[in-house]
């Protein structure tokens, strides 16, 4: 359009008419007309847009549809485009916009348009409050306050709508104007003449409380609004409006404490609405959501009202029965997604969450009898719902259901023969869920009955949907089934799977049906993955059929089957190994290459993509360096997938409501009626592709060198990819492997890559919000330091790292204090304690990663790092105080162990910090702490120098006491005990003047061999070699009397896989055996005391060392 009006120059009539026509074109049914109009609109300057749109909104002669479009565009312009447009408007235009907007809101007579103007008003007000809370539109706030004090109901509605849309509109004045806010909300929520006012005031009150979620004092002041809010919830639901109920759900989720004074009323109302079949499904589900959400966010409060929860359970179960008699279900060839809008699915999810929230002690007694009655019903819907209820409560009622698991499983197994296919499918689903919830005990206890029953169900050719569910349950069962148990059934299982495969393959060829076949190939893959080399005898049975499926499945609707079959082939190849797989390797690689070529020309969301990415990685593992020739064909699409950028948007809540659930977007409410959205399709594929790049860098090393620059430039920015945790994990994991690859190209290239990686990696440690991802980042940083070595961090890096680690340690102590406070609160119970323990485990895990980073620094920098470390010293000393929890003491001692091992003799200057903690913790009840202390005493002897002599002398009796303890060799204690034995060996070897060697040596020899701690075991064997090679009389014994014992120690070392042929110690031990063999009598005496396994172990040692 020609419109070019500028500041101070009014638009001409023709320009306005052109713009109105443009607005009409934007709502034209013709796609082409709309697209042209959108292009013209986008090119109009922001000033012109603002003035034209505001004029159009106010012009009642323009027509409602045009005004509506103008309002939507102006709201969007002042929302997402505010920073680009409004600050660049001349001051007089900004003033005019604010004045015109107040007038427009005040004078508008059309109710719907007035709401849209209020939306625009709220958006502008939100953007005119700065970060300090200062309101730069005082006239707008004055208008709002005047509206509150007026007697005009329309102006009340305006004030409420703006306040609901932007509850922070008062800014810094809020504290002083709380009475005004409360007056507005109170007078409107009591208004019996105007239901719309009452509803809107309840929503505004909820929005205000949510906006002040951390202001506990405000909850008390505004608590007397709650009865009005609850009444508005009730009334609005029966007027077909669920908006206030949605607000109540938000309160339950974010500020449950606000509901405290009226919690029983809230629960009773929710129970009533949930059970009222006159209401819509959504309203009933929202009412149930209030109860379920409170079970998660206010568990202790809700446990005081278990009588209401007990009344809710029948309602939940009744909703689970709300199923349709769908005749097409039996013949469907697609496994449809759960309909989360249905009562049955929503109620099943609610029961699951309720059980997890309140625990089995509360929920199981409430549900058990109801479920048993449902399972006995003649109506299939009740039997189906009863089974799905059992499936839902398993995780939350885990501990309580263990004692009744036998009867429960036996009951569920009966329903695999139910006359109704939906019930049989539900029984399969329940068994699969139990296999997850009760693993691995479920597999160990029920393998015989469950495997046989699921295989029989798969053999039943009457219904492929049921077959598919049975196959899915078997896959889940196999995931946690020990290999030793699964191999017991492998013959019958293979026979069954192969016979079904043959039939399903024929059905695919004849009818194109694929559903059961998709699950079947995944089941075969799971079996191969679990039994590994035991699958070799069955390889030739399956591989031809699987390759045939890949060749056949070329149509679009068979892509998922093709992808799953490719995955299955790669799993089988990995299971049977390169030697067996090589007969088909070339053929399989050609199939993969053909699929890869097709994928390069297909949509980004092709279902084969993720399967292909994983399959290539397995082929790499199978073929090793032989895979290198295929890498150029694989890497480009992989990098393309890993580089994909997700669509993101910042939208008003109203825009979000207009978007379809099928658009693939997920939104997070940011408050103030704004939501952040991300299109999630493709994120999983991106994460998988990133993981595969890590894998190739790790496995191929020199074969990956030429791609390192491209990949590192991709991965480093992904450390801040907050849309998907696994992408950040992969980015972190890749760093040390990429550095290893870069080292092959030379030190200069390596240094350049480290310079690119180091700073973002350190910053990520400080900013990463997720504990699991943070641990991976910290682990990656520690490994990277070990790759780079001494001097890899400059002063700025060390300063930043020191600050971050200090903050992590201080946060660790602060979190422990907060947990102790929670343990003193009124609502503290076993459930709260479990939650606190989970938090503590997360904190301790991060502490272990702090220890890993310090270990890498001490091991590379040695004593040069100690001046930097001293800023952390008080915090590490605090960890080993006797009052600290045992994991703190364990990891604090480990850090000092590293200092002693890598920074001696300088480490002695810290001895007064750790001397007594090291000695006293030898008596600790926790074996992990004893192990850390014993290891420290051992490295003192080995690396500490003469200064540590007296401490080593003091340590010996303490170490001996632990070793001689009656339960020292139990599974729980053995690692700590073996570290004590190793420590005594180190004192004997490196500090012999601290102890009576001849007195201690016979005891030390009697404690050998070590079985569990391989690293310490090889050190003890090395010292034993020293003693034998020097013909130490105490070790050899009078008349060689100790040699049979020594030979048995060596044999056990081989059996326990302590002896590694690459270790020089292996050759020395073999030489000891050969030396004994030179005396036939002595050798026969030694051998006579060995069993067959020990003799075979010695022979193997002699053959290879």
Curated annotation (Swiss-Prot):
SUPFAM superfamilies assigned: ARM repeat (SSF48371)
Keyword Hydrolase: no
Sample GO molecular function, one term: nuclear import signal receptor activity
Ranges in coiled-coil conformation: 806-842
Gene Ontology biological process terms, A to Z: protein import into nucleus
Keyword set includes Coiled coil: yes
UniProt-annotated stretches for the region Ran-GTP binding: 333-383
HEAT repeats: 219-257, 361-399, 402-440, 444-483, 866-905, 908-946, 949-987
One GO CC term, this protein: mitochondrion
Task of the protein: May function in nuclear protein import as nuclear transport receptor.
Matches recorded under PANTHER family: IMPORTIN BETA (PTHR10527)
Protein name: Ran-binding protein 6
């Amino acid at each position: 359009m020609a419109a070019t009006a500028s500041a101070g120059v009014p638009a001409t009539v023709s320009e306005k008419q052109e713009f109105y026509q443009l607005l009409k074109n934007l709502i034209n049914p013709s796609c082409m007309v709309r697209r042209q109009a959108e292009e013209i609109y986008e090119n109009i300057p922001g000033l012109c847009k603002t003035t034209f749109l505001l004029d159009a909104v106010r012009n009642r002669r323009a027509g409602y549809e045009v005004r509506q479009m103008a309002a939507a565009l102006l709201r969007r312009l002042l929302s997402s485009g505010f920073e680009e447009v409004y600050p660049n408007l001349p001051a007089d235009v900004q003033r005019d916009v604010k004045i015109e907007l107040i007038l427009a809101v005040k004078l508008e007579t059309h109710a719907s348009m007035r709401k849209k103007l209020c939306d625009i008003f709220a958006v502008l007000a939100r953007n005119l409050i700065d970060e300090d809370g200062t309101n730069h539109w005082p006239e707008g706030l004055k208008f709002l306050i005047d509206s509150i004090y007026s007697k005009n109901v329309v102006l009340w509605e305006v004030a409420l709508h703006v306040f609901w849309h932007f509850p922070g509109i008062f800014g810094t004045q809020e504290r002083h104007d709380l009475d005004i806010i409360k007056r507005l909300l109170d007078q409107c929520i009591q208004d019996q003449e105007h239901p719309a006012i009452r509803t809107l005031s309840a929503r505004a009150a909820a929005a205000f409380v949510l906006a002040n979620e951390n202001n506990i004092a405000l909850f008390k002041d505004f608590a007397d609004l709650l009865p009005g809010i609850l009444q508005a919830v009730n009334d609005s639901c029966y007027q077909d409006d669920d908006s206030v109920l949605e607000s109540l759900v938000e309160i339950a989720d974010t500020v449950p404490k606000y509901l405290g004074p009226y919690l029983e009323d809230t629960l009773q109302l929710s129970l009533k609405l949930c059970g009222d079949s006159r209401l819509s499904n959504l309203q009933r589900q929202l009412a149930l959501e209030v109860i379920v959400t409170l079970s998660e966010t206010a568990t202790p409060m809700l446990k005081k009202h278990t009588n209401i929860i007990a009344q809710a359970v029948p309602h939940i179960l009744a909703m689970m029965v709300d199923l349709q008699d769908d005749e097409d279900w039996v013949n469907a060839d697609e496994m449809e997604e759960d309909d989360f809008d249905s009562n049955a699915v929503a109620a099943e999810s609610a029961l699951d969450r309720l059980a997890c929230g309140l625990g089995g002690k509360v929920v199981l007694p409430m549900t058990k009898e109801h479920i048993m009655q449902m399972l006995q019903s003649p109506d299939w819907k009740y039997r189906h719902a009863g089974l799905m209820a059992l499936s839902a409560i398993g995780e939350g009622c885990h501990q309580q259901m263990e004692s009744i698991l036998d009867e429960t499983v036996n009951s569920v197994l009966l329903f695999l023969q139910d006359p109704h296919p939906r019930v049989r499918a539900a029984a399969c689903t329940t068994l699969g869920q139990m296999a997850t919830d009760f693993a691995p005990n479920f597999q160990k206890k029920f393998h015989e009955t469950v495997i046989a029953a699921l295989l029989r169900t798969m053999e039943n050719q009457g219904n492929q949907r049921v077959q598919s569910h049975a196959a899915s349950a078997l896959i889940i069962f196999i995931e946690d089934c020990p290999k030793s148990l699964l191999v017991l059934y492998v013959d019958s299982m293979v026979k069954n799977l192969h016979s079904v495969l043959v039939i399903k393959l024929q059905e695919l060829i004849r009818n194109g049906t694929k559903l059961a076949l998709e699950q079947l190939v995944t089941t075969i893959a799971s079996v191969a993955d679990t039994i590994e080399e035991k699958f070799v005898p069955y390889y030739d049975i399956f591989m031809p059929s699987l390759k045939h499926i890949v060749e056949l499945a070329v149509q679009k609707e068979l892509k998922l089957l093709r992808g799953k079959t490719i995955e299955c082939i790669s799993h089988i190849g990995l299971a049977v190994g390169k030697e067996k797989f090589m007969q088909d390797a070339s053929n399989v690689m050609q199939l993969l290459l053909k699929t890869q070529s097709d994928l390069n020309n297909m949509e980004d969301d092709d279902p084969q993509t993720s399967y292909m990415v994983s399959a290539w990685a397995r082929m790499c593992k199978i073929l090793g360096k032989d895979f290198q020739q295929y890498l150029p064909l694989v890497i480009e699409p992989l990098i393309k997938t890993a580089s994909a950028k997700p669509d993101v948007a910042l939208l008003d809540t109203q825009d979000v409501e207009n978007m379809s659930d099928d658009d693939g977007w997920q939104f997070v409410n940011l408050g103030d009626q704004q939501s952040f959205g991300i299109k999630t399709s493709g994120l999983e594929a991106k994460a998988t592709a990133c993981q595969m790049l890590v894998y190739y860098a790790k496995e191929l090393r020199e074969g990956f060198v030429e791609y390192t620059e491209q990949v590192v430039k991709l991965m480093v920015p992904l450390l801040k990819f907050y849309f998907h945790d696994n992408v950040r994990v992969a980015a972190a994991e890749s760093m040390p492997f990429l550095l290893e690859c870069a080292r092959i190209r030379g030190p200069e290239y390596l240094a350049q890559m480290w310079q690119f990686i180091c700073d973002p990696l350190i910053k990520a440690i400080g900013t990463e919000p997720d504990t699991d991802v943070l641990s991976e980042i910290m682990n990656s940083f520690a490994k990277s330091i070990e790759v780079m070595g001494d001097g890899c961090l400059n002063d700025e890096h060390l300063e930043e790292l020191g600050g971050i680690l200090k903050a992590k340690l201080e946060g660790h102590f602060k979190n422990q204090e907060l947990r102790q406070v929670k343990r003193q609160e009124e609502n503290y119970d076993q459930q709260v304690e479990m939650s606190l323990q989970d938090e503590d485990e997360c904190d301790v895990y991060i502490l272990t990663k702090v220890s890993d980073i310090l270990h890498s620094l001490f091991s590379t920098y040695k004593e040069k790092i100690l001046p930097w470390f001293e800023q952390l010293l008080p915090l590490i000393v605090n960890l080993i105080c006797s009052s600290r929890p045992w994991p703190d003491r364990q990891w604090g001692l480990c850090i000092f162990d590293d200092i002693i091992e890598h920074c001696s003799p300088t480490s002695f200057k810290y001895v007064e910090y750790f001397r007594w903690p090291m000695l006293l913790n030898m008596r600790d009840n926790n074996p992990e702490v004893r192990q850390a202390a014993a290891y420290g005493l051992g490295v003192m002897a080995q690396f500490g120098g003469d200064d540590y002599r007296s401490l080593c002398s003091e340590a010996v009796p303490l170490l001996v006491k632990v070793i001689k303890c009656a339960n020292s060799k139990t599974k729980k204690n053995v690692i700590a005990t073996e570290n004590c034995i190793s420590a005594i060996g180190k004192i004997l070897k490196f500090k012999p003047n601290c102890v009576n060697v001849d007195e201690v040596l016979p005891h030390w020899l009697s404690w050998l061999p070590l079985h569990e701690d391989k690293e310490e075991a090889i050190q003890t064997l090395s010292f034993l070699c020293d003693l034998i090679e020097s013909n130490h009389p105490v070790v050899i014994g009078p008349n060689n009397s100790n040699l049979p014992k020594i030979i048995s120690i060596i044999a056990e070392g081989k059996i326990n896989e302590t002896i590694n042929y690459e270790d020089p110690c292996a050759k020395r031990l073999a030489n000891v055996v050969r030396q004994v063999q030179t005396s036939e009598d002595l050798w026969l005496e030694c051998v006579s005391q060995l069993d067959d396994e020990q003799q075979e172990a010695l022979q193997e040692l002699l053959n290879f060392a």
